[in-house]
Amino acid sequence: MAFAGLKKQINKANQYMTEKMGGAEGTKLDMDFMEMERKTDVTVELVEELQLKTKEFLQPNPTARAKMAAVKGISKLSGQAKSNTYPQPEGLLAECMLTYGKKLGEDNSVFAQALVEFGEALKQMADVKYSLDDNIKQNFLEPLHHMQTKDLKEVMHHRKKLQGRRLDFDCKRRRQAKDDEIRGAEDKFGESLQLAQVGMFNLLENDTEHVSQLVTFAEALYDFHSQCADVLRGLQETLQEKRSEAESRPRNEFVPKTLLDLNLDGGGGGLNEDGTPSHISSSASPLPSPMRSPAKSMAVTPQRQQQPCCQALYDFDPENPGELGFKENDIITLLNRVDDNWYEGSVNGRTGYFPQSYVQVQVPLP
């Protein structure tokens, strides 16, 4: 039997080479069969490519996919089942926003509160994405894998067997073998032809099941985007409220502290009873102490006043009507805050507007 099988394989190989190299004509199948073969070949490529691209669609980061595959392989070798979920980008961004929102402090910062709200929304979207992954894998990828490993594999097996029996039949006819051998080869050829045709027909005419799987895919995507839209709609409303809250909050005035305010010890920040720095003798130098310079002296005096005022840090030359010009170290009485960048004030009997960046507030407006 072994020798007979080997001889048959040699005869089929001989027939194949004769057809390819010698120009011998083999049995031709009809156009309908060849069209089914073409569509089946396309289906084989489709199922393989569709699985690959769907996985890339659900998990687009190739580095993360490679890491997950490596962990899975190591787990199999070690005999330990170790789960490793794909890091959704929404989840990574959520973690970043939540972490730094909490570090900033939610009690005093509307921005920190908004970050936390945004992070929580992204976290919900990541959970919805995981549900989408599970749905697609179960209802779309698994049926494709089943088709690839069962239906397509069976059809391709019948086609391969048909090709071998066709070569055996043509070889026996070309060599003018005995009638019973030719008849036996023809019967087997006909049997394989029928199995291959039926298998390809059933595969190609199963549109209802294939389209149903696409419907499931589309429904899963629709549900995913609908849930994400609901989450984002709620987030947008919350952030609008946070923005209104931030706009309605009174702006805090900030007066930078000087070394005198800090009352530093040891490094020269302390003062003697006469107001001179403790580490400098009154006769140590004829030059005035920086802490007693006119600019600093003027900076201290207005703080004792009740009237809102500021000290000019630089010269300001007005360029437009209504602006108030002044010189460095001038003390300007604050009358009104125009906006975040401009004040209204008076100095030397003149009144006008001036930029906030040119002054240091000594006594803030009430």
Curated annotation (Swiss-Prot):
Keywords of this entry: Coiled coil, Cytoplasm, Endocytosis, Membrane, Phosphoprotein, SH3 domain
Gene3D superfamilies in the cross-refs: Arfaptin homology (AH) domain/BAR domain, SH3 Domains
GO molecular function ontology, one term from the record: phospholipid binding
GO cellular component: cytoplasm; cytosol; glutamatergic synapse; membrane; type I terminal bouton
Domain BAR: 18-248
Low complexity composition bias: residue spans: 277-294
Coiled coil: 227-247
InterPro entries, A to Z: AH/BAR_dom_sf, BAR_dom, Endophilin_A_SH3, Endophilin_SH3RF, SH3-like_dom_sf, SH3_domain
Disordered: annotated segments: 266-295
GO biological process annotation, one example: synaptic vesicle endocytosis
Main localization, broad class: cytoplasm
The keyword Signal is annotated on this UniProt entry: no
Residue ranges of domain SH3 in the record: 305-364
SMART domains the UniProt entry points to: BAR, SH3
Family recorded in the similarity comment: Belongs to the endophilin family.
Function, in words: Required presynaptically at the neuromuscular junction. Implicated in synaptic vesicle endocytosis.
PANTHER family: ENDOPHILIN-A (PTHR14167:SF81), SH3 DOMAIN-CONTAINING (PTHR14167)
Name recorded for this polypeptide: Endophilin-A
Phylogenetic placement of the source organism: Eukaryota, Metazoa, Ecdysozoa, Arthropoda, Hexapoda
Gene coding for it: EndoA
